[in-house]
Every structure is written in C-alpha cells, then in structure tokens.
C-alpha cells in the first residue's frame, strides 16, 4: 500500500496535466481541478506522515513542492494563457513528486520524464544556438546517468548522482539548463521551476552526502567560490528580470555546496536552508510574474516606482528582498545552532570566508539595486496600474510563511 501510494500521488497531477494539455478545457476548470488535485496530494502526504514510516526530510521536500505548486496555480486568473500555465505546473508537480517520493528505477523514470519535459520546453523556443546545443547535451548526459546509475557500482553511482546534483543545485558551469528554463518559462511556471528544481537537487545531494570524500569536498568548495563570483557578477549586470532571479539563485546555492564540509549532518541544516532559498527566490519570481502578466514587463528599470500605485506588490517585494538579504546568515547560524564546525585547514577557512562575503555583499548590492529599479522611484504616468489581486497576494504570503518556517522554525 505504501509503495503504491508513492506512485499514485505523483500520477494524479501528471495525468491531469497531460490530459488537459491535449484537450480544450476551460481555464476555470483547469485551475479548480488543479487545486483539487493538490488538496488530494496534501491529504495523502498527511496520511503517510502518520500511517507509514516515511523519512521526515522526504515529506518536508515533497510538502515544499506541493506548497509551491499551490501558490503557482492559486494566483492565476481565468484566461487561456493561465490555463497553459496551470497545465505546465501540474506536469512539473507530478514529475517532481515522483522523483522525491520514490526510489531506484521508479525515481529514475520520473527524473528522465522531467528531463525530457525540460528538453521539450526548451526546444519549443526554436533557438538553434551553440549554447542550446550544450544544454541538450547536458540534459542527454543527465538522462543517461539517471538510467544507468541504478546498474552502476557504488563509486560510479556517486559520480552519476553528483552530476545530477550539481545540475539541480546549479553550480557554474552546470547551470545553463536552469538559466534557460527560468528564462523561457511563462508566468508562475518560472517560480515553480525554481522551487522544484532546487528541491530535487537537495534530495540528490542528501543521498550522496555520506559518500563524498574530502577531496570531493575541497573541489566542490572551490567550484562554489567560482560559481558565486560568476553568478553575482551576472546578477549585477542583468536587466532581464527572470535571468536576474536565476543568477541570484545560483549565487546563493553556492553556499550550500561551500559549507558541506563546514557542518556535518547535511539533512539538519542544508535541506531547511535550501528550501528557504527556493521559497524566497520563487516568491520574487512569482511577484514579478504577476506584473509581467499585466504589462508584459521583462526588463528591470522599465517600470519604476511600483510600490506607490501597487501597495500590495510593494509590501510583498520589500519583505521578500529583506528576507533574501539575510539568507546567508540563516544558513550560518542554523548550522552553528545544531552542530560544531569541522573545518581546520587555513585554505578551507579562507575559501569559505570569500564565498560567504561574495554571496552576502554581492547579494546586498544587486537586491537593493533591483528594489530601487522596481518598487521605489517615480511611477510612470502612462501606465494603467492595477494592484495584486487577493489570491495573488495570498500566494506570495504563503511562500513567505513557508520560507519563515523552513529557515527559522524547522
């Protein structure tokens, strides 16, 4: 019964999304049934919490995906574009839950399905560039590693899962699929991608953490420093709002990798911080998507002063950015509260200090700069402003509350 439920729950939104994708359903029906499916999944997870011996971290990761899916669908209005967005969110929800909840070959099948969906989504944009070819090669390698990892020896299995982990907890240069899918996604889909993408990466890293050697830890810390510097510089010069959020996410993800050797027991500090990061970045992306649906806004600085004519938007964005500014501190203090540090070598301490300063100071710079380009300043007089609807505001607040619970309480 337990194993069957682990497969059935992800199939509910996946099959609904696939059926609706190739049928002419009304947008209101898609949204209502999508919310109903999420309610059934939430009830199923609640039942599993008490009826079966399921690892608490797995339920926490699955619950994070369900909450993000709820928020991504809840704020949609009744239109054909919103219907397409809800369908994409349901497909992502089903595939992501299948990866988190299941084991061995079933997990690999869901992961290959998600990677295939990513490739199809990117290919639909018909961008035949060298970077696109690299992304497709990356996805192909991830599919091969996912399918073959079940049959590999223990050592090769660790490297295969590590490749998938650095893809979904993106480090430079493995971040290209993440940047492209966030850039190409419409509306709230980009927000949901951020949460589901990082959640899958956290689950993969949790699996292989005990198998990582000291040499791997050192290499990953060095790569994390390079990734943080590169992504922070990319965020500072980024005008496209979706790429700004994606680059900022990559910069902060570097902290997860960089502190792996500082604190033991990744499950106790890494997963809560990763989910907090996903909710905050997903919340900013969701807030931006609501403005983009109204005005087609994609470039930072084009619509300044939004906090004045759109007070709900202003409050939500200021709170999210304030939370984002303190993200590095959440991870450090949450780690120190539950365990001692284990780093003793001077070179490791130096790299970690550089990483922390780059992410914190760089993040403070580009987040405040973004805030001044959007919420503050003088609003344009030629734009018919309309503030966030109640459902949109609730969706953003739900992600904020989720981030607070994960970062402070859990």
Describe the residue ranges of each PLM region:
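Structural signature of hydrophobic alpha-helical transmembrane segments
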Residues: 1-12, 51-65, 100-115, 155-167, ...
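Transmembrane helix-loop-helix hairpins at membrane boundaries of multipass inner-membrane proteins
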Residues: 1-89, 409
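Alpha-helical multi-pass transmembrane bundles of energy-transducing inner-membrane proteins
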Residues: 16-32, 77-176, 180, 188, ...
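Short helix-boundary/re-entrant hairpin motifs in multi-pass inner-membrane proteins
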Residues: 29, 36-51, 71-77, 134, ...
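Predominantly late transmembrane helices and immediately cytosolic-facing juxtamembrane segments
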Residues: 175, 274-296, 350-387
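Interfacial segments of multi-pass membrane proteins
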Residues: 256-263, 335-353
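Cytoplasmic/organellar membrane-interface segments at the starts of transmembrane helices
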Residues: 310-312, 364-410
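Alpha-helical transmembrane segments and their membrane-interface junctions
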Residues: 321-342, 400-410
């Amino acid at each position: 019964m337990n194993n069957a439920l682990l497969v059935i729950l992800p199939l509910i939104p996946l099959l609904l999304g696939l059926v609706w994708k190739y049928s002419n359903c009304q947008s209101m029906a898609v949204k209502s049934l999508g919310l109903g499916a999420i309610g059934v999944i939430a009830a199923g997870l609640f039942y599993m919490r008490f009826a079966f011996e399921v690892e608490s971290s797995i339920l926490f990761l699955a619950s994070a995906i369900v909450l993000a899916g709820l928020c991504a669908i809840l704020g949609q209005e009744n239109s054909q574009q919103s219907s397409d967005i809800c369908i994409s969110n349901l497909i992502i929800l089903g595939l992501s839950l299948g990866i988190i909840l299941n084991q061995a070959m079933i997990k690999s099948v869901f992961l290959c399905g998600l990677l295939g969906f990513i490739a199809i989504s990117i290919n639909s944009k018909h961008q035949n560039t060298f970077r696109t070819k690299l992304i497709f090669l990356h996805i192909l390698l991830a599919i091969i590693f996912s399918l073959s990892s079940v049959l590999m020896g223990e050592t090769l299995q660790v490297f295969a899962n590590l490749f998938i982990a650095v893809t979904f907890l993106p480090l430079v240069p493995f971040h290209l699929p993440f940047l492209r899918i966030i850039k190409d996604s419409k509306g709230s889909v980009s927000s949901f991608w951020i949460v589901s993408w990082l959640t899958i990466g956290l689950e993969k890293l949790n699996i292989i953490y005990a198998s990582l050697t000291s040499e791997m830890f050192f290499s990953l810390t060095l790569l994390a420093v390079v990734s943080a510097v590169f992504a922070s510089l990319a965020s500072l010069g980024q005008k496209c709002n979706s790429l700004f959020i994606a680059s900022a996410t990559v910069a902060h993800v570097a902290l997860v990798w960089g502190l792996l050797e500082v604190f033991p027991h990744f499950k106790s500090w890494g997963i809560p911080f990763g989910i907090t990061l996903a909710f905050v970045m997903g919340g900013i992306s969701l807030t931006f998507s609501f403005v983009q649906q109204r005005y087609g806004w994609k470039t930072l600085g084009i619509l300044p002063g939004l906090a004045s004519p759109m007070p709900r938007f202003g409050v939500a964005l200021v709170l999210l950015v304030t939370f984002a500014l303190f993200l590095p501190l959440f991870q450090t203090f949450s780690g120190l509260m539950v365990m001692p540090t284990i780093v003793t070598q001077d070179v490791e301490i130096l790299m970690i200090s550089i990483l922390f300063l780059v992410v914190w100071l760089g993040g403070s710079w580009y987040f405040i700069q973004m805030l001044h380009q959007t919420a503050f300043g003088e609003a344009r007089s030629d734009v018919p402003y309309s503030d966030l609807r109640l459902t949109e505001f609730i969706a953003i607040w739900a992600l904020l509350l989720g981030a607070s619970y994960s970062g402070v309480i859990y």
